[in-house]
Regions:
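Short amphipathic alpha-helix
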Residues: 15-23
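Short, aromatic/basic amphipathic alpha-helical patches
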Residues: 43-55, 207-216, 278-281
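Donor-binding and catalytic core of enzymes assembling or modifying cell-surface/extracellular glycoconjugates
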Residues: 10, 186-275
Length: 288
């Protein structure tokens, strides 16, 4: 049996679910299930979102099944404590602290429990079409989203700026700063002539002050998708022709799900402020 732990915001959940799909492909005769137990008492983001957004159905591992190959934690707090105190079991496949790609993940026989973020498309490239199908968004209903969708053309550019919870966080701050976005906008303009920019951010005021002078095309600030409808921003990003992303799994997926065969994606070459960390981006993406 293979069990994949799901935890985090929407982008992280999507990476973990993509691994789940890939394991199903690699081990068709084994049962593959999800461990959702840590969402109990987890108050960050919007909880487990994959079923609500994508209507996905997946086998959920029972407490007994989890205890057989790992440790069962009935809530998020106990997991935070237990992961520091309890020894790693041989059946537990923990992602490297440097997030290095591990090709053995998809070939490990027998019972395995997968705990990590798995933010590397190589973990699921072999079942790319299956992942794309799983992450098919529901149709837009809100007037503002439908109106913007009609305006998007072959030269529309999505820019995702994540500040808010990143400000003051030593792990993330200082990577996608003003200099990054200025360089990314300039670089994008060497590939295409933008017809419009769509700005997605949790700090629109900062974008208006710092980025507006460099945007030489009409700008739309997308501010209306909030709370449990926040995923609509990712959906709109994927509908734009081109993407400038942040060091965020949310905008990574917005760009990856973009099906424009001629898309230009500009991304930060560094993802975290950690030594020896590896975050391989798709080869076709432009890294700065």
């Amino acid at each position: 049996m293979k069990i994949v732990k799901i935890l985090g915001g929407l982008g992280n959940q999507m990476f973990q679910y993509a691994l789940y799909l890939s394991l199903q492909e690699s081990f068709p005769k084994e049962r593959v299930a999800l461990d959702l137990s840590c969402f109990n008492g987890y108050h960050l983001h919007n909880g487990f979102e994959l079923e609500r957004i994508f209507s996905l159905t997946a086998q959920k591992a029972s407490a007994a099944a989890i205890m057989r190959i790992a440790y069962y934690y009935p809530n998020y707090l106990l997991w935070r404590i237990g992961k520091r105190l309890l020894p790693r079991r041989k059946t537990m496949c923990l992602e490297s602290s440097t997030f290095r790609y591990d090709e053995s993940v998809l070939t490990r026989e027998g019972d395995r429990y997968f705990d990590g973020y798995w933010q590397d498309e190589r973990y699921f490239l072999a079942c790319r079409e299956k992942v794309l199908k799983a992450f098919t968004f529901p149709a837009f209903k809100r007037t503002e989203n439908l109106s913007l969708l009609r305006k998007l053309d072959k030269n529309s550019v999505a820019i995702h700026v994540r500040r808010g919870d990143y400000i003051g966080n030593q792990l993330y701050q200082g990577i996608c700063d003003f200099d990054y976005y200025r360089a990314a906008i300039e670089k994008m303009c060497t590939y295409v002539t933008p017809s419009m920019f769509c700005i997605f951010s949790n700090d629109i005021a900062w974008c208006q002050t710092h980025l507006q002078p460099y945007l030489k095309a009409p700008v739309i600030y997308v501010t209306w998708n909030t709370g449990t409808e926040s995923y609509r921003d990712m959906q709109l990003m994927s509908c734009c022709a081109h993407n400038i992303i942040a060091n965020s799994s949310f905008s990574w997926w917005g760009a990856w799900l973009n099906q424009n065969s001629a898309k230009v994606v500009i991304a930060p070459k560094r993802w975290l402020n950690m030594d020896n960390c590896q975050f391989p981006l798709p080869a076709s993406w432009v890294k700065i």
